Design a protein with these regions (language model features):
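Solvent-exposed, conformationally flexible loop/turn segments
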Residues: 1, 59-62, 109
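Short, solvent-exposed loop/turn segments enriched in Ser/Thr/Gly
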Residues: 1-7, 80-84
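Asparagine-centered strand-capping/turn motif at beta-strand->loop junctions
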Residues: 8-15
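A short beta-turn/strand-edge loop motif at beta-sheet boundaries
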Residues: 16-20
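The feature marks short-to-medium sequence segments in extracytoplasmic or secretory-pathway proteins
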Residues: 21-59
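Short Pro-Gly-centered flexible turn/kink motifs
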Residues: 56-69
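Short, surface-exposed ligand- or partner-binding patches at beta-edge/loop junctions that are enriched
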Residues: 74-96
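Acidic, serine/threonine- and proline-rich intrinsically disordered appendage/tail regions
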Residues: 78, 96-121
Length: 121
């Protein structure tokens, strides 16, 4: 079926609790740090069930997670798909992103399906 995915984890390294509500933003980057085509779709997909947005309280040292999936087989007229070297992830309701090394070959114009942030299990 060509689906791949990963679970990403936010860990609270502060001395105070923090909260999340909703979905992350994301931007795929090439090896030079330039933006690749990226289309973030909220709501999960084939690999990850979306719990929907809920307020997630994370105590100091605690974590929250979200799932991300993509298709790595060319879609429609695509013959190849760009592969990222890293990804910028923006937590819900934030403007500052985190850059994470990640080799992702997202076909379909860089389509990424994401779940809402949820408590880590």
């Amino acid at each position: 079926m060509g689906h791949e995915g990963a679970t990403f984890r936010f860990t609270n390294d502060l001395d105070t609790p923090c909260t999340f509500y909703g979905y992350v933003g994301a931007q795929l980057l090439d090896a030079a740090g330039h933006a690749l085509p990226t289309d973030v779709i909220r709501g999960g997909g084939y690999l990850f069930r979306d719990p929907g947005p809920e307020l997630v309280a994370v105590p100091p040292g605690g974590s929250a997670t979200f799932g991300m999936e993509w298709v790595h087989i060319p879609v429609g007229a695509e013959t190849t798909c760009p592969t990222s070297s890293s990804i910028e992830v923006t937590p819900p309701d934030e403007r500052t992103f985190l850059t994470i090394p990640a080799r992702i070959m997202a076909c379909g114009g860089g389509t990424l399906h994401v779940t809402a942030v949820q408590p880590a299990s």
